[in-house]
């Protein structure tokens, strides 16, 4: 894969500030270096502290610290970005709602890039519609798999890790290994809408994907 090639070639490795960072964070350095090597002169890498609040009762809805601020890390560690011929933009924006996202993008892109406010709002709304459509498709597929399991007396496993574990570059083929034994594999976001979490929880579900994990686990415990 492209990500694997970036990693194997060790692109951007000199700008990674800590070995303890997650694999996607390390890849980000390589991708930025790859873009610069291709002569790209404009890079937009926003920081996204808040995710959509998928559960009203959730304690919070942050993204993880990497997603929240990694654009800043890149800016401060990739020396090539100091070149005046490179435009690098990393505003902080929130995905809490399409209106909040659009308002923040209008303030930033309207001022910095002179993009029409109406065009920005339309794009943000369309993006949110597509995001919801994709989420719905994932949930419908989860329900389809659950029905298949019930109809055929099959078992399934919920692979409930971090969001990026869905990437074949990272998960080492574990989903395919499981399905080769005729066991269904579900992601946490394919069934989280079916769960009901007993609240208050012992831990604050600070990040949105934690809320999905708790909801998915709550559903799993109701199944035979």
Kindly give the residue locations of the regions a language model identified:
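Beta-sheet entry/capping signal
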Residues: 1, 40-44, 85-87, 155-156, ...
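Short, small-residue-biased leader/transition segments that mark boundaries at the very start
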Residues: 2-7
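N-terminal beta-loop-helix "entrance" segment that forms/cooperates
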Residues: 8-25, 194-208
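Short acidic, glycine/serine/threonine-rich loops at helix termini
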Residues: 10-16, 53-62, 99-105, 169-172, ...
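N-terminal glycine-rich phosphate/adenylate-binding segment common to multiple enzyme folds
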Residues: 15-16, 22-90
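A short, acidic, amphipathic alpha-helical segment used as a generic capping/interface helix at domain edges
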Residues: 28-34, 208-223
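Glycine-rich phosphate/diphosphate-binding loops that line cofactor/substrate pockets in enzymes
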Residues: 36-39, 144-155, 219-223
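A charged, amphipathic alpha-helical module
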Residues: 92-192
């Amino acid at each position: 894969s492209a990500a694997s090639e970036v990693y194997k070639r060790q692109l951007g490795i000199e700008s990674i500030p800590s070995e303890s960072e997650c694999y996607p964070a390390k890849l980000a350095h390589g991708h930025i270096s790859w873009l610069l090597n291709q002569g790209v002169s404009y890079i937009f890498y926003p920081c996204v502290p808040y995710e959509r609040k998928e559960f009203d009762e959730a304690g919070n809805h942050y993204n993880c610290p990497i997603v929240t601020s990694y654009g800043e890390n890149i800016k401060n560690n990739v020396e090539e970005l100091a070149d005046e011929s490179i435009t690098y933009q990393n505003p902080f924006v929130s995905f809490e709602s399409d209106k909040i996202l659009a308002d923040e993008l209008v303030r930033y892109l309207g001022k910095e890039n002179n993009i029409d406010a109406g065009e920005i709002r339309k794009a943000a709304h369309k993006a949110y519609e597509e995001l919801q459509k994709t989420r719905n498709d994932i949930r419908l597929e989860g329900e389809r798999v659950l029905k298949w399991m019930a109809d055929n007396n099959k078992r399934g496993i919920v692979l409930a890790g971090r969001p990026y574990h869905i990437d074949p570059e990272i998960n080492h083929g574990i989903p395919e290994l499981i399905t080769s034994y005729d066991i269904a594999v579900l992601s946490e976001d394919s069934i989280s809408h079916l769960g009901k979490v007993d609240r208050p929880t012992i831990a604050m579900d600070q990040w949105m994907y934690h809320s999905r994990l708790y909801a998915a686990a709550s559903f799993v415990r109701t199944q035979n």
